[in-house]
């Protein structure tokens, strides 16, 4: 009954709609109803993404750089993509996890989407490097490491002493 309602809603995607999230057979069954499924924010290794792909459990793979163990593992996951699966990193972060996700996207798929929480921050730790422009784009910082240096004055101001 709910499948028809969801299809009529013309969702961009339905994210991790089944519990537990590693129920890849259940996700595959739901996906066959024509609903775009995004999954992977709770997966921790490339092996789980391989299983997700082999079960055709999602249209959109959403690895989280901090949950999968960093940049190397998320690159392995992004390189697994095949059969028209999209990779849209899950990034509900405001700090180094977000910057690491931007670097991965820039290295592998610069035209990729990124899932990001949007809130107006009281202070900008990264001097505007994580700001979204009027077209919804984010510039990828090109400095060393994660591409930027944090604003030390902001760190000092908001540090708990």
Give the ranges of each region predicted by the language model:
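Catalytic core of soluble alpha/beta enzymes
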Residues: 1-92
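Flexible C-terminal active-site loop/helix
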Residues: 92-161
């Amino acid at each position: 009954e709910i499948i028809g309602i969801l299809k009529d809603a013309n969702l961009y995607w339905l994210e991790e709609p089944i519990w537990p999230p590693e129920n890849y057979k259940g996700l595959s069954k739901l996906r066959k109803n024509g609903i775009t499924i995004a999954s992977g924010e709770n997966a921790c290794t490339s092996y789980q993404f391989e299983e997700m792909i082999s079960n055709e459990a999602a249209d959109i793979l959403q690895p989280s750089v901090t949950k999968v163990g960093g940049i190397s593992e998320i690159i392995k996951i992004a390189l697994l993509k095949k059969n028209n699966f999209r990779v849209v990193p899950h990034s509900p972060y405001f700090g180094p996890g977000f910057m690491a996700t931007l670097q991965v996207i820039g290295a592998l798929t610069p035209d990729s989407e990124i899932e990001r929480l949007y809130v107006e921050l009281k202070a900008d730790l990264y001097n505007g490097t994580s700001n979204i422009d009027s077209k919804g784009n984010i510039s990828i910082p090109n400095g060393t490491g994660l591409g930027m240096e944090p604003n030390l004055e902001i760190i000092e101001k908001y540090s708990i002493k």
